């Protein structure tokens, strides 16, 4: 149920941003440019203690429990299409995740990781994406 609410909230937020950008400007969550990576099933639970599933990502520890809305970065630092909506339930093991420069998207296998990485590296954007973190707890 929480996942459905999170996805619905993300879709509503995305539609609102694109169709009423001036209405939303005062309360819009910070849009961050981050490097995106992908990881496959490790056979371990996430930092928050759950088993990973599609829609889970890793980021800095203080972001656990938040939802990340991830957009493609286009040349000229323009926002592209929605890549996905992810629940931050893990921290990742790289220094970039720990320091807040990387979002690490969970994929069920290495082939899916490669497809994800191909998508974020297209158009010469070097794996950079735009991310908004929203609080969906409570």
Feature names for model-found ranges:
Residues 10-12, 72:
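Short intrinsically disordered, low-complexity segments
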Residues 23-138:
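Solvent-exposed, well-ordered loop and adjacent helix/strand elements within mature globular domains
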Residues 15-22:
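C-terminal segment of classical bacterial N-terminal signal peptides
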Residues 1-10:
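N-terminal Sec-pathway targeting helices
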């Amino acid at each position: 149920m929480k996942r459905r609410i999170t996805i619905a909230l993300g879709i509503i937020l995305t539609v609102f941003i694109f169709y009423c950008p001036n209405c939303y400007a005062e309360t819009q969550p910070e849009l961050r440019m981050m490097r995106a990576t992908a990881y496959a099933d490790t056979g371990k639970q996430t930092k928050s203690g759950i088993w990973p599933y599609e829609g889970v990502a890793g980021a800095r520890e203080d972001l656990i429990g938040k939802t990340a809305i991830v957009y493609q970065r286009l040349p000229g630092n323009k926002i592209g299409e929605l890549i996905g909506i992810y629940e931050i339930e893990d921290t990742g093991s790289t220094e970039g995740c720990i320091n807040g420069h990387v979002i690490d998207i969970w994929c069920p296998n290495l082939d899916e990781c490669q497809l994800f990485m191909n998508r974020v590296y297209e158009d010469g954007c070097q794996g950079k994406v735009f991310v908004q973190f929203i609080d969906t707890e409570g």
